[in-house]
Amino acid sequence: MRTSLIILASLTLLTGAIFALWPQLDLSGSALFHGTDGFAFDQPHLKALRAGLYYLPVAVIGAFAAAWLGALMGLPLPTALRPRGRSLVFLALGLALGPGLLVNVILKDNWHRPRPVQVTEFGGPLEFRPWHRTDGACVKNCSFVSGETSGAFWLVAPASLAPPPLRLPAVALALGVGLTTGVLRVAFGGHFPSDVLFAGLFTLILVAVLRMILIKPDKQGLRGDDPYL
């Protein structure tokens, strides 16, 4: 896990350096989805997909909470479907501190970065700002970073609690959901590429730190014989 943290921190620093030195990469990435009629991928079927992905983290933690309450009430649930309290704390803290506090409370309302649909390069009234500039004209719910992408990458947390034979495929699936959500946010003109990359990296770092603190080594996930969860 410490190796994962080092890798994630290094990727975050590298991402920051690349998009600070070449901020036009954000404009070029968003321009791939922009045409004469605006952001062409803003279509009903893709909006429906976005809505499903948006509510997926809430559905997942709701399912964990329901299973935990069911086990607490003595319902005859299979061992693999009986999460322990420490697992639920891990998931709840990850969702509250990552997509909740860090992204939506601290960053989005205080970084002042205009969204792609708001900047002059794509027909909006505001001036583009690189990710490291906090003097943009956006006032609230701004572009840096992507809340939906952060929530989607949080799904790595419950995926990491899967039984060992299923853990790697579950984590890979969660990462795929995160990447898909990030691409959709760029395609809709809601965020620049750096917004979604930072959202994913920040969330993965937080999940890794919480997992190190709350989940004991070699006693992870939904294992029924785990006395520590």
Q: What kind of region is each of these model predictions?
A:
Residues M1-W68, K108-R115, T120, E127:
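N-terminal transmembrane-helix/juxtamembrane module of multi-pass inner/ER membrane proteins
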Residues R2-T12, F128-L229:
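Membrane-embedded catalytic cores of phosphoryl/pyrophosphoryl-handling enzymes
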Residues T15-A20, A96-L101, G176-V186:
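Aromatic-anchored segments of alpha-helical transmembrane domains
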Residues A20-L25, L101-I106, F188, L204-V209:
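Transmembrane alpha-helix boundary/anchor motif
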Residues L21-W22, A66-A80, A159-L166, V209-I215:
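Structural signal for the C-terminal ends of transmembrane alpha-helices
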Residues F41-Y55, T79-P83, A162-P169:
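Juxtamembrane loop-transmembrane helix junctions in multi-pass integral membrane proteins
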Residues L53-I61, V89, S194, F198:
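Alpha-helical transmembrane segments of integral membrane proteins
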Residues G70-N110, V171:
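Interfacial segments of alpha-helical transmembrane regions
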